[in-house]
Curated annotation (Swiss-Prot):
The protein's annotated pathway: Metabolic intermediate degradation; oxalate degradation; CO(2) and formate from oxalate: step 1/2
GO biological process: oxalate catabolic process
Species this protein is from: Escherichia coli O6:H1 (strain CFT073 / ATCC 700928 / UPEC)
EC number: 2.8.3.16
Enzyme category, top tier: transferase
Catalysis: reaction(s): formyl-CoA + oxalate = oxalyl-CoA + formate
InterPro entries, alphabetized: CoA-transferase_III_domain (IPR050483), CoA-Trfase_fam_III (IPR003673), CoA-Trfase_III_dom3_sf (IPR044855), CoA-Trfase_III_dom_1_sf (IPR023606), Formyl_CoA_transfer (IPR017659)
NCBIfam families the record matches: oxalate_frc, PRK05398.1
Annotated family: Belongs to the CoA-transferase III family. Frc subfamily.
Name of the molecule in the record: Formyl-CoA:oxalate CoA-transferase
Subunit note: Homodimer.
Length: 416
């Protein structure tokens, strides 16, 4: 089966999550992704949060499927020679080292262009070069804090909160992926590669654009009507935290369902749509609200919004969350059960769609991983296991023209 990136070679000089999430997607699209790792050590996530002693951790295996792994010591002359040959044949190189790290290896962008002017160089950093935080080490939650997500997440009477979703890491990888694919198309027109940089702060900010929208509205109005603080609370000079409110002009909230006392996920998310208010009133047994001036418009409802959700919860708390969603869907009400990761891992529909995939690695055995979120009509990504450390070192070196004796010598010299 033909794949979109068949024939594209990618050098994966990344670790942890932001870079590997990008290169894994390239591999799913058919690129030959060669993960370059330190001899005997490898990506740090191979060893982090292990559930089986001395076996690659799920942290690694779920971010590096479909790749090949080589061990290469770029501090040695032989290692640098191999790296230069790899660059000469590659289409894309991706790195997410601390600023300046790859330059210190001797592979500046200028030098890379001399070796291979068609190469696309993807780079992930915590902050843009013009940021005062450019030299700050960035991880997931650092990016969420600096990108506007933490300050706008949580409840108004509590501290900023970070999201469990990887807004700083995997989200940055997906943003870089888009840039790399655009650069590939641009190369078709110009014949030349280019550098594509992605900061984690920018990636988080791109998902917080509605909060930047709200900041400008707040500056002009002094209040934000769709936030729970309106009309009885107070607004400061920055966008506040809104709890579980919808934030998009459609009020929403998390509501309890039957069993909430013992099940931490016995909840649904319920959204009130202006155009569907009549159906909402019918669904919750409050038809009188349809014509009541105190409830008939979104503006009129906002002062009573918590009373409205409390009334809806009187119904939802009596039934199972799945029953609640099934019932409310009949009235075209946007809602969903709060699904635990246990429920997601066992959901047969997610297995059928390929969103959750079971793969097998030689030492670990079978494990679940997240599959490709995009569904294509012309091809289906074949999700394979992550590589063992250095599993493909010899094969890749042979492809570069090295003999068995030369490979053995490099091993002896600790270059591989």
């Amino acid at each position: 089966m033909s794949t979109p990136l068949q024939g594209i070679k990618v050098l994966d000089f990344t670790g942890v999550q932001s870079g590997p999430s990008c290169t894994q997607m390239l591999a799913w699209f058919g690129a030959d992704v060669i993960k370059i790792e330190r001899p005997s050590v490898g990506d740090v996530t191979r060893h982090q949060l292990r559930d089986i002693p001395d076996i690659d951790a799920l942290y690694f295996t779920m971010l590096n499927s479909n790749k090949r792994s080589i061990e290469l010591n770029t501090k040695t002359a032989e290692g640098k020679e191999v790296m230069e040959k790899l660059i000469r044949e590659a289409d894309i190189l991706v790195e997410n080292f601390h600023p300046g790290a790859i330059d210190h290896m001797g592979f500046t962008w200028e030098h890379i262009q001399e070796i291979n002017p068609r190469l696309i160089f993807g780079s992930i950093k915590g902050f843009d070069e013009c940021s005062p935080y450019v030299n700050v080490k960035a991880y997931e939650n650092v990016a969420q804090a600096a990108g506007g997500a933490a300050s706008t997440t949580g409840f108004w009477d509590g501290p900023p909160l970070v999201s469990a979703a990887a807004l700083g890491d995997s989200n940055t990888g997906m943003h870089l992926l888009i840039g790399l694919l655009a650069a590939l198309l641009h190369r078709e027109k110009t014949g030349r590669g280019q550098r594509v940089t992605m900061s984690m702060q920018d990636a988080v900010l791109n998902l917080c654009r509605v909060k930047l929208r709200d900041q400008q509205r707040l500056d002009k109005l002094g209040y934000l009507e769709e936030y729970p603080q309106y009309p009885n609370g107070t607004f400061g000079d920055a966008v506040p935290r809104g709890g579980n409110a919808g934030g998009g002009g459609q009020p929403g909230w998390i509501l309890k369902c039957k069993g909430w006392e013992t099940d931490p996920n016995a909840y649904i998310y319920f959204t009130i749509q202006e155009q569907n208010w009549e159906n909402t009133c019918k669904a919750i047994g409050k038809p009188e609200w349809i014509t009541d001036p105190a409830y008939s418009t979104a503006h009129a409802r906002q002062p009573h919004i918590f009373d409205i959700f409390a009334e809806i919860e009187k119904y939802t708390v009596t039934i199972d969350k799945h029953e609640a969603v099934a019932y409310l869907t009949q009235f075209d009400i946007p809602c969903a059960p709060v699904l635990s990761m246990k429920e997601i891992s066992l959901d047969p529909s997610l297995r059928q769609s390929g969103s959750v995939v079971e793969v097998e690695q030689p030492l670990r055995g079978k494990y679940l991983t997240v599959g490709c979120p995009m569904k294509f009509s012309a091809f289906t990504p074949d999700i394979k296991a992550a590589p063992l450390l250095g599993e493909h070192t010899a094969a890749v070196l042979q492809e570069l023209g090295y003999s068995d004796d030369e490979i053995a010598a490099m091993k002896q010299n600790h270059a591989i």
